[in-house]
Amino acid sequence: MARLLPGQRGRRGLLTVPRRRTKRRWLRWLLLLAVLDAAVFYWWWSNQAERRYNGIIREAAGEHGVEYALIKAVIWQESRFREDAVGDAGEIGLMQLMELAAFEWADDHGVHDFEHSHVYDPRTNILAGTYYLKTRLDRYRHTDNPLPYALADYNAGRARVVRWAREAARTNSTAFLQNIDFSSTRRYIDQVTHRRDHYQ
């Protein structure tokens, strides 16, 4: 029987180490493939979700005179196209609409028997949300650029916009943006604006 020199392993030890390495290598490859598969599926699902509401968004854009790309950007920012999304403050659906705003739309458009559950309907949510966005854009039409004011109002509310829109910022959007002391609202405006450019 051959003697082993110090530091040498028997035949079984020599075979076991490469097998373990091969197993680990295969596991790494399988894990990598699983991650890539999940990423491709997520990309495909996201694109499908974004396209699903294009017809309704076009309808809302035509009805209310709001840019198609802007409506789509607000939906992306608010809910990532999840029609069952519910916000911490009770915002509902694709455009994260407050119930009161939805009822205002229903009243203005003569929609009878309007109920809370109707706000979850994608078409109703997009039409009512676009109507609400349009009223905000109209509210600040006297400014050099109504968009940041309207988005700030949509995100943070009228009272905060009034506080930020003082002196020159009343009509100057650059000054207005500098006055916004909520980083989340500044980020919201920036992300919606960039996403709108992406959809144009």
Predicted regions, residues:
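Export/targeting segments at the very N-terminus of extracytoplasmic proteins
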Residues: 34-84, 88, 106, 111, ...
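Catalytic and substrate-binding regions of cell-wall glycan-acting enzymes that process beta-1,4-linked
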Residues: 148-200
